[in-house]
């Protein structure tokens, strides 16, 4: 399949591998746009038809850059900006992701030599003045995003005064999201069951071809280091596997690595089947408490009629004797009940 280029007004659709151009160019600079291969240049366009896709009316995207439409393959857009300033800051022409090298160029009118060059981010100088017109960050991070500009003094035949370039917004895109550790089937597995830890993250669509390596940790101790699998399996969980787990996803060159939040796993012990409780053996009955005995004391009732007094007091003494006998009977029944309970439970 042959790649193609198309120039439409200010938007330039190019083949990144063969185009010699910059994101921002000075009006007096000489830039070369080159489109290789058998092409058609009708209507100031640079196109290349694909042999196998001619006549295809549907648009199909492939990869991060090019797409096909009606038999033609196009690269992603390239925006060319022409400036008439004395000094410009030239940023990267393609998207910058975490781990990439970020290179900035401070370019003067007609590439006149500069001195006392300073690069800035968000208005703060990134270093002392120098003669180098290039600034680079070997491993870009998201925190390196911001507005950059540069300043410098022209050597002859320039104006001789310090010039400052307009700010350029630089965005370092996230290569992959911070991972999240998940436990399947749950973070509270039963003892003896299996547990699978999954370190979940996703690469940026434009860098989906990159490969990540995964590591797993428990309580600060490494369980698995830099493997291609995003899962770690515990075949038979026990109480020893309870603890704090986390995972790490990293690029192959280890330039970018991110850790997941900790996940607390508590293995639940197996519950033993409930057994019927055996009642404690009944205590042997102790001696019966002393009960009052019939009293021969004279009753306290007294009437004017001696015979009535005699009959009333005798009746009261008989009632007292009955009460004492009933008390003895109740105690006997309690003792008998205490002896019969264990036999009833066993049966």
Swiss-Prot record:
Regions of compositional bias (Pro residues) in chain numbering: 276-292
Annotated Gene Ontology cellular component terms: cytoplasm; external side of plasma membrane
GO molecular function, a single term: transmembrane signaling receptor activity
InterPro entries recorded: Ig-like_dom, Ig-like_dom_sf, Ig-like_fold, Ig_Fc_receptor, Ig_sub, Ig_sub2
Alphabetized UniProt keyword annotations: Cytoplasm, Differentiation, Disulfide bond, Immunoglobulin domain, Repeat, Signal
Localisation: Cytoplasm
SUPFAM superfamilies for this protein: Immunoglobulin (SSF48726)
Disulfide bond residue pairs: 106-150, 199-247
Chain spans, region Disordered: 272-296
Signal peptide: 1-27
Alphabetized Pfam families for the sequence: Ig_2 (PF13895)
Span of domain Ig-like C2-type: 77-166, 179-257
Example of a GO biological process term: cell surface receptor signaling pathway
Functional summary from the UniProt entry: May be implicated in B-cell differentiation and lymphomagenesis.
Subunit structure: Monomer or homodimer; disulfide-linked.
Name recorded for this polypeptide: Fc receptor-like A
Organism field: Rattus norvegicus (Rat)
